[in-house]
Amino acid sequence: NRPCVTIPDDHDIGQGNLWGESGKKSMRKDGNDGGYYFHPEYVKMVERAQTAHLPDAYHQAPLEQGIKAYFTSLKIGGVDFAIIEDRKFKSGPNGKIPRQGPRADHINDPNYNPESINLPELVLLGDLQHQFLEEWGSDRSSQMKAVLSATGFCGGAHLHGKASNRLHADLDSNGWPQHGRNKALDLIQKAGAVHIAGDQHLPTVIHHGIEAF
């Protein structure tokens, strides 16, 4: 008898990580070239199972391979929730940025230049969700606003086991691409919203910066 919001994440559709690139087909099982590796009907089935109870999606037209968007808003008990898809439109790193670690999405060089991977053509949320958040943020009819997403807008977890395995950038996190991350946080800030996300394995409270860190 309690409302429940579920957001499909990478493991739900059979991938270790997901950079959806608007629903395109990935040619790699690890998915880091961007897109979905498994059959689109399977992807759509998973998303129906986990999001069919949500309000109608903001964007109704199908994306690539017929995969649909589900990002939407939901008002419960005086709180206006924006439910966004931070994986579905995101660019995959493989072949788009210089490789600086053991994997296309892992950078372990402490001297790397963040601007070398912050390329303007790379996408995080994309124009459709920027438009949605602009409109949602301008509605002040609720007591409180909150944004829900699959993962956070930073690399909150840096260690994968030993200290020698520290990642200086994990491109699965929404800290990348940085310009997309900054745009998302700017829209969340303008809305006066808090942000609640999953995925990073460790409970973390983060105070984000946009101009200063």
Model-derived features: where do they sit?
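Long, structured stretches of catalytic cores involved in phosphate-ester chemistry, encompassing
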Residues: N1-F213
